[in-house]
């Protein structure tokens, strides 16, 4: 049940104030649980603070002094069922160590899904040894090793950063449409693999923002055997007073949309997104590499927003 995966039951909530992340992280399974819950919490934060679902589609949880809203299965709100199914599909790919990046994309024209208005990137790495991941100390990344308390603090900081940004963004268009693209590590992912709720995607070589895009790094968390990095790209005009609270990328926004086998140089292997320009991946780059496997939801989601 997705409800159990995303938010547990109400009795657990009463038993502890810190119900989201496990109290100890000592092995690969517990590390996976942390990353799953962090991913689900971030998606819940985004959908709640961007006003995509009603209050009734969320459950209350606490993480230290943070009051969080966690998306739940709400039969009265079919959209919540769509998103939870997407999250479950990501969980399946994470368990198998196939998932490289999940990209939650918001656009307005169903005939032009490449013309985006907001993007949320979740990039995943794996290690068998459980060693500490290295993150850029000059950015708003949060280092964490295998110490359980450090991991919880890192998760809390990342979620807090995301909350700060969401609360300082201007509103989305009323007719926004949601989809999620999943990118894989080609070397280990079977050619015919598709997570539940997903199908093979048509590979797009470009994305387009109608306005000027700005890319913001929310941070990174390592849980020992897994790590997750979060980046948000939105229109610059949508930024209110949170510009100095998060780390911005200078110049042209780069989205890792193709060529996702480049583990260490994320920005170098993405397709650029520029103001009113379709920027294609260089043919010489793509022709020298195996075609990238990408999945998309069987059904996209159109929120009933007014």
Swiss-Prot record:
InterPro entries: HORMA_dom, HORMA_dom_sf, HORMA_MeioticProgression. It comes from the Eukaryota. SUPFAM superfamilies: The spindle assembly checkpoint protein mad2. It is found in: Nucleus; Chromosome. Residues 29-232 form the HORMA domain. The modification Phosphoserine is found at residue 271. Phosphorylated in a SPO11-dependent manner. Essential for synapsis surveillance during meiotic prophase via the recruitment of ATR activity. Plays a key role in the male mid-pachytene checkpoint and the female meiotic prophase checkpoint: required for efficient build-up of ATR activity on unsynapsed chromosome regions, a process believed to form the basis of meiotic silencing of unsynapsed chromatin (MSUC) and meiotic prophase quality control in both sexes. Required for the DNA double-strand break-independent, BRCA1-dependent activation of ATR on the sex chromosomes that is essential for normal sex body formation. PANTHER family: HORMA DOMAIN-CONTAINING PROTEIN 1, HORMA DOMAIN-CONTAINING PROTEIN 2. This is HORMA domain-containing protein 2. It comes from Mus musculus.
